[in-house]
């Protein structure tokens, strides 16, 4: 939803960006389950964008923007830079949502209100400096 809102606000291709955002983790396996990995390129973080693209192509017709978003949403792990502004938006929204989910998990598990306060102060100082 954030991708849609941001892309719509900046008059970008919100339809393709939203569609790709919904398909970017379309890998159809439980990544929590242990599996044999022969190299670091087979680790979930590196492999799932390509698997998600393959699964998406089997089920839907995608344009170049959607393909780029799906394959490069794990940047900088994917090394290649995203080609489109919408790709960067999905990448950063994905990272933002993952961070929020992580802190919700920590808060639920450990009741870490102080962690939020220090994280807020740290991020504020970090962004104000640059």
What residue spans do the PLM features occupy?
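Metal-dependent phosphohydrolase cores
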Residues: 1-130
């Amino acid at each position: 939803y954030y991708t849609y809102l941001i892309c719509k606000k900046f008059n970008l291709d919100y339809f393709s960006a939203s569609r790709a955002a919904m398909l970017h983790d379309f890998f159809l396996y439980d990544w929590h389950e242990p599996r044999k990995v022969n190299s670091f390129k087979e680790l979930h973080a590196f492999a799932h964008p390509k698997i998600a693209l393959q699964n998406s192509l089997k089920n839907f017709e995608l344009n170049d923007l959607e393909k780029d978003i799906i394959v490069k949403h794990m940047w900088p792990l994917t090394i290649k830079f995203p080609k489109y502004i919408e790709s960067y938006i999905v990448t950063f929204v994905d990272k933002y949502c993952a961070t929020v989910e992580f802190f919700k998990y920590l808060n639920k598990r450990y009741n870490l209100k102080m962690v939020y306060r220090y994280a807020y102060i740290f991020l504020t100082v970090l962004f104000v400096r640059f």
